[in-house]
């Protein structure tokens, strides 16, 4: 299999403040977390894991042949859970890159994951994350995050506000990250920063501590499920693509 030095980790915890038992919600006849895993697994990497504190989530994943790493329920963030899972991977000394894929994107495209990996390996960035060009109407929701970049595509700032102010086209941030191993180790050793806490965005801890984030353009904004309304949209999307035979 390709990219033997890369691990993909999907953090998933059962408790959710906005949508009860979110990972186990059904989209069609399949749970959200199973759909995420199956999409990610199409990238074809051996080291693909779901990191969870839940026996129920673990059961769903192992039944479809996936690998699970149990992590403590007290772990505060998805990135921290990703690192804890990485430490428990057998022979992890051979892994140099870790990709964190959020467990709430049921239709994530495997090509986006592979693009992160290739870009990370062929650049000097500490972290790489995907972005999508969108218009103003597409990023009005407060849960959306936009990013400002320099001419080389290096991230300058992430915000829940629309940046840059006054623009008609924006760069939407997709919540996936490719880390170099040493960058992930450094990240989890650092305390949450002022901007991170203000914006409620972990990636600002990277920038505030002088590390670099590269961005790679992908074509589509993936559906993220955080609320009951999001779930309804995901179910509708699934029904539509099913009718088309996709």
From Swiss-Prot:
Describe the reaction catalysed, as an equation: 3-deoxy-alpha-D-manno-oct-2-ulosonate + CTP = CMP-3-deoxy-beta-D-manno-octulosonate + diphosphate
Task: State which pathway it belongs to.
Answer: Nucleotide-sugar biosynthesis; CMP-3-deoxy-D-manno-octulosonate biosynthesis; CMP-3-deoxy-D-manno-octulosonate from 3-deoxy-D-manno-octulosonate and CTP: step 1/1; Bacterial outer membrane biogenesis; lipopolysaccharide biosynthesis
InterPro entries in the record, alphabetically? Cytidylyl_trans (IPR003329), KdsB (IPR004528), Nucleotide-diphossugar_trans (IPR029044)
Output one GO BP term: lipopolysaccharide biosynthetic process
Gene that this sequence comes from: kdsB
Q: What is the annotated signal peptide range for this record?
A: none
Q: Which UniProt keywords apply?
A: Cytoplasm, Lipopolysaccharide biosynthesis, Nucleotidyltransferase, Transferase
Q: What is the source species? A: Rickettsia conorii (strain ATCC VR-613 / Malish 7)
Instruction: State a single Gene Ontology molecular function.
Output: 3-deoxy-manno-octulosonate cytidylyltransferase activity
Q: From the Swiss-Prot or TrEMBL record, give the protein name.
A: 3-deoxy-manno-octulosonate cytidylyltransferase
Q: Which domain of life, per UniProt?
A: Bacteria
- What EC number(s) has UniProt assigned to this enzyme? 2.7.7.38
Please name the HAMAP family in this protein's record: KdsB (MF_00057)
Query: Which GO CC annotations does the UniProt entry carry?
Result: cytosol
What's this protein's family per the entry?
Belongs to the KdsB family.
Does the entry annotate any disulfide bonds, and if so which pairs? none
Q: What are the subcellular locations of this protein?
A: Cytoplasm
Q: Does the keyword Transferase apply?
A: yes
Q: One Pfam family from the UniProt entry?
A: CTP_transf_3
What the protein does? Answer: Activates KDO (a required 8-carbon sugar) for incorporation into bacterial lipopolysaccharide in Gram-negative bacteria.
Does the record bear Transcription regulation in its keywords? Answer: no
């Amino acid at each position: 299999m390709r990219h033997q030095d890369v691990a993909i980790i999907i953090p998933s915890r059962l408790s959710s403040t906005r949508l009860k038992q979110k990972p186990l919600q059904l989209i069609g006849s399949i749970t959200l977390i199973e759909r995420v895993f199956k999409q990610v697994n199409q990238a074809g990497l051996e080291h693909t894991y779901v990191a969870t504190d839940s026996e129920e989530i673990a059961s769903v994943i192992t039944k479809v042949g996936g690998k699970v790493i149990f992590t403590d329920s007290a772990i505060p963030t998805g990135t921290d859970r990703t690192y804890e899972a990485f430490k428990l991977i057998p022979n992890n000394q051979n892994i140099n890159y870790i990709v964190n894929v959020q467990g709430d994107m049921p239709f994530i495209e495997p090509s986006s994951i592979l693009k992160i990996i290739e870009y990370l390996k062929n650049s000097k960035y500490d972290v790489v994350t995907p972005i999508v060009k969108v218009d103003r109407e597409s990023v009005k929701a407060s849960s959306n995050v936009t990013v400002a970049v320099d001419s080389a595509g290096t991230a300058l700032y992430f915000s829940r506000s629309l940046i840059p102010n006054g623009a008609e086209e924006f760069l939407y941030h997709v919540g996936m990250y490719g880390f170099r191993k040493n960058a992930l180790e450094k990240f989890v050793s650092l305390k949450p920063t002022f901007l991170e806490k203000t914006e409620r965005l972990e990636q600002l801890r990277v920038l505030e501590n002088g590390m670099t984030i590269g961005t790679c353009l992908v074509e589509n904004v993936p559906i993220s499920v955080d609320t009951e309304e999001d779930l309804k949209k995901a179910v509708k999307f699934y029904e539509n693509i099913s009718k088309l035979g996709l």
